[in-house]
Amino acid sequence: MTTWYRIIAGVTRTFSFKRGPVGCVALAVLFAACSSTMPPPNDEAVIGGGVTRHSLVFIIHGDGDYLYHNTLGEARRADEDILAQAQAIARKLPNAEVTIFHEIARRHVLFLIPRHDGRAFYYRQGKLLGKTSYWRDQGNSRFAPEADLYAKFADAQSTSPVRMFLYFGHELPELNVQGYDASYPDRRVSVGDLAQGLSTFTGAADKFDLVVLGTCFGGTPHTIDALAPYARTIIASPGDLHLSYFDLEPLATLDIKRDDGAVTAFADRFARNAFDRLTRDVQTAVSVVVYDVNATQAFRAAVAEDYDRTLAMANGMPASVSHCDCADDPAYAHSEMSNGLTVLYRAPRFGRMKNDTHHSGWECWNTGEVQHADNPDNAGARP
């Protein structure tokens, strides 16, 4: 039986302390905060002899403003709620490995010693086999720390499991901008960083069967195109998405194979469950879309040049741009617009858009220069 071992997680900073009780206490706190439990790589005596049929990776961004108040007026953090859901799911899956990364704000012990700003949890067959804390500023890319830990955690003996990746956080910028990570205000982040992270998680020869993008405005041609090389199916919202109400419960009974359209059927069920929860709990517009990546390729290719041009314009006039349904812009009125999409949409209960009954499933930028598209034959357009 492989012995569980303790390691001191990568501490890259050194400190000096005065002799005395305060220094000893500070040092003890530092090492207590840095100690981690790593999983035995493939210890059957510990984890049992079950087969890993599903592999789930969660990245939950909590390094920002995720405070909200529930219907009872209680203050809560959306990222902590999603973390609790993910951990509960992990404990219920006997044939899965689940890796959860929680990116948190950097804090200090005794106002001096920086604490790790990332937490990782590894479950296999419903058991928590490992957890560790880590620094999020290590590595040559935004998600390199998570990818490196995943490589250490993952079950190397599993053969072709159904693979899912779920990201929860604020809207991922389409251009490199500062301010996404509160602890790293000067660091530039874009959806391209997530795409690069996915490429590291999947390796050169594989894709995630399902990617869930739990952010606002994730259903844009640019975002789906960036993630497309690493995913077969994507669930995203082209509009606002209330993270605190996103329901993970369908994952608790996950029991599917890659064949016979099972992943697609599960994606539809997962999206419908999230949509039903959102429409029950919020009054604003709700949109959840399932994208069959291969089937959307023709539309993405047809609009890429126009979208990139508009994106560049939007970058130069941030005060005057807003999101809009791509169907409102004639430049995107292509016959392939609806291909590969399952669109779930409900208009807001109030405001000028309360009578809208349809959404194309694609979100674009309005620079104030476009007119509503007159294309009634396009199935993706609003009526």
Task: Describe the function of each predicted region.
Residues 13-15, 29, 297:
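Short non-domain terminal segments
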Residues 41-80, 84-103, 109-383:
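Terminal, contiguous helix-loop blocks that mediate binding/assembly
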Residues 1-18:
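N-terminal secretory signal peptides that target proteins for export/translocation
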Residues 32-33:
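C-terminal motif of bacterial Sec signal peptides marking the signal peptidase cleavage site
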Residues 19-27:
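Sec-dependent N-terminal signal peptides
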